[in-house]
Design a protein with these regions (language model features):
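C-terminal helical "tail/cap" subdomain of flavin- and related membrane-associated enzymes
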Residues: 2-40, 49-57, 129, 334, ...
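Conserved FAD-binding catalytic core of PHBH/FMO-like flavoproteins
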Residues: 139, 159, 171-340
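Conserved mid-domain beta->alpha element of the FAD-binding
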Residues: 65-85, 89, 222-223, 251, ...
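Active-site-adjacent segment of FAD-dependent monooxygenases/related oxidoreductases
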Residues: 94-176
Length: 460
């Protein structure tokens, strides 16, 4: 909600406008009333209720969400809270069928979490210090809440970063769906999309289910099925061959702190993020949970070599990581104590940025998250952008369709998708580019620039 413009601001603007009219020059910018959080929903768009609203099939389109990762489940939750009918299709047989990655850091998406009905994340860990070292342990940069408090700096951080296991966040979102009155109809496990085509009634989807082909109908299809999106391939013809290799490999692992009981280091206090680099290899270590840390080692490597190393499996990846990181404590100890079963590695890819024109002719189908704008992991933005995409799309569906039955005549692309895609692509484009740039400068001498700020900021 907007507050009233203060009298002092009005008078200042009127004086500046009078001066402009009399003497010319640059016209003053008209002041805008400041925004304040709604007292009913506190800025989340939600109010507490015993049950979610019933799905409104008269006002809203039936949404088919392809992919049960963080972005897809977040969209399902956002639809549930707004009475938008949806079905979530996931190819895995159940929640635990395969690993859903390691840890992630909620940055600007922390507010989006509240907009998805999650008041707190019990498994989340807040970091208050970020340290950058060279390989002998010399600190070349440090920032975060504790840094500013220790130095009595006058500026405080605008937000904190919350670290959480990807599966923990995904589970917290899925638990929101438990309130659905027909959960078994709303979430379809074991459904792999094999085809879709537009019909006069909407979109017909075909799924491979336990060796059979089953069909379903929807008004709107949302591809939230990751970097190798089946939806994207079907509507744009862009498969894995159109991925863009970023000339490096990432090896990840999770180490329980109990395996480091004989290691004394303030870097292992579950509230510190640290990274160490030499201008070629770079390791990043962050809290994974209260009792474990996650590490990510990355370095340049030819694509064929990276694919071969990844294919060799966890033991080979761990051995490669240990061999490359005989640096300051506790890095060698962390990697040595990491169970091989908790190590994985992959070549790092993204895709060229999509344009709105590329999506203009695909009808009532859209993409979000990695399906729309995959990016390198080096800025920690993938999950954040997927959450923002999901909340944005649900809100625009409400705005474009509620009390406006004309969406059936005008079409969802004009009524909803053009606005959503323009906002999503503009917001995520800078993140994709920054993440690609980071894949380069984090493996160069730039990462060792002495300054108390995130790496790469000195380039801007």
């Amino acid at each position: 909600m907007r507050l009233r413009i203060r009298k002092k601001v009005k008078l200042s603007y009127q004086a500046a406008l009078l001066h402009f009219e009399q003497h010319g020059g640059t016209a003053p910018e008209q002041p805008k009333a400041p925004l304040a959080a709604c007292p009913n929903c506190h800025g989340t768009g939600l109010i507490a209720a015993e049950h979610p609203p019933a799905a409104d099939t008269e006002q809203y389109p039936q949404v088919a969400i392809i992919g049960g990762g963080i972005g897809g489940v977040a969209l399902a939750v956002a639809c549930l809270h707004r009475g938008i009918p949806f079905t979530l299709y996931e190819r895995d047989s159940d929640f635990s069928a395969r690993s859903q990655g390691y840890g992630l850091t909620l940055q600007q998406a922390s507010k989006a979490i509240a907009g998805l009905g999650i008041v707190s994340l019990d498994q989340g860990v807040v970091s208050t210090r970020h340290v950058v070292h060279n390989t002998d342990g010399t600190i070349v940069g440090e920032w975060g809440m504790r840094k500013w408090l220790d130095t009595e700096a006058t500026h405080a951080p605008k937000r904190t970063n919350v670290h959480i296991a990807r599966q923990s966040l995904r589970l917290a979102l899925l638990e929101q769906l438990d309130a659905h009155p027909q959960l078994h109809e709303a979430v379809k496990w074991g459904h792999q999309l094999v085809n879709l085509h537009e019909t006069p009634a909407g979109v017909e989807l075909s799924f491979a289910v336990a060796g059979e082909i089953k069909t379903a109908q929807a008004d709107l299809v949302v591809g939230a099925d990751g970097i190798r999106s089946a939806v994207r391939n079907l509507v744009l013809g862009q498969d894995a061959n159109s991925l863009r290799y970023l000339d490096c490999i990432a090896i990840l692992g999770i180490c329980p702190l109990s395996a480091l009981s004989d290691v004394e280091s303030d870097l292992l206090d579950s509230a510190t993020v640290f990274q160490t680099a030499n201008g070629h290899e770079r390791i990043y270590v962050m809290p994974f949970a209260a009792d474990s840390v996650m590490w990510q080692l990355s370095f340049p490597m030819a694509e064929s070599e990276a694919q071969a190393l990844s294919a060799q499996g966890a033991q080979a990846l761990k051995a490669e990581a240990c061999q490359r990181t005989q640096w300051h404590a506790p890095i060698p100890q962390i990697l040595a104590a990491t169970p091989a079963a908790l190590v994985s590695g992959y070549p790092v890819y993204d895709r060229a940025l999509l344009s709105a024109d590329a999506l203009a002719d695909i009808g009532p189908v859209t993409l979000l998250g990695d399906a729309a704008h995959p990016m390198s992991p080096f800025k920690g933005q993938g999950a954040n952008q997927a959450l923002l995409d999901a909340l944005s799309l649900a809100r625009i569906i409400v705005r474009g369709c509620r009390l406006k039955p004309s969406w059936r005549e005008l079409g969802l692309r004009e009524r909803v998708l053009e606005e959503f895609e323009a906002e999503m692509l503009e917001r995520s484009a800078i993140k994709v580019q920054d993440s690609a740039d980071a894949a380069e400068f984090l493996h160069s001498e730039v990462v060792l620039h002495e300054s108390d700020e995130p790496r790469g900021r000195c380039l801007k």
